[in-house]
Amino acid sequence: MTEAPTEFPPEDGTPRRELGSTWVIETLKEIKEEALKHFDPCLLIALGNYIYNRHGDTLEGARELIRVLQRALFVHIRAGCDRSRKGQTRRRAPCPAAPTPRGMH
């Protein structure tokens, strides 16, 4: 079993990032790109501001935003999003995620 290489701080004097930070940042970029295809940008900005106010500019905040966006996308697509399967016509899910409100059939 080999040891993990020692991590050194950047030469330009910026602080060292936590392990996995590159993965978190790349994942956040990908999920934000997908979320923009399905949700109103104003809603996503409000969500980002809310999480930023709670966590600041930290990896924990980025992880929290990833968790929330994953859940929102899952529920949205499960409920029958038109864009969830390209090339297929929309059909009702056998078990919709949320019941239809009264008077909106």
From Swiss-Prot:
GO biological process, one term: symbiont entry into host cell
Signal sequence region: none
Transmembrane segments: none
Keyword Transcription: yes
Keywords: Activator, AIDS, Cell cycle, Host G2/M cell cycle arrest by virus, Host nucleus, Host-virus interaction, Modulation of host cell cycle by virus, Phosphoprotein, Transcription, Transcription regulation, Viral penetration into host nucleus, Virion, Virus entry into host cell
One GO CC term, this protein: host cell nucleus
Location within or outside the cell: Virion; Host nucleus
Region entry Disordered, spans: 84-105
Pfam families documented for this protein: VPR
Phosphoserine: modified positions: 84
Other facts: This isolate is from a Gambian case of 'neuro-AIDS'.
The protein's assembly and partners: Interacts with human UNG.
Function: Stimulates gene expression driven by the HIV-2 LTR. Prevents infected cells from undergoing mitosis and proliferating, by inducing arrest or delay in the G2 phase of the cell cycle. Cell cycle arrest creates a favorable environment for maximizing viral expression and production.
Protein's recorded name: Protein Vpr
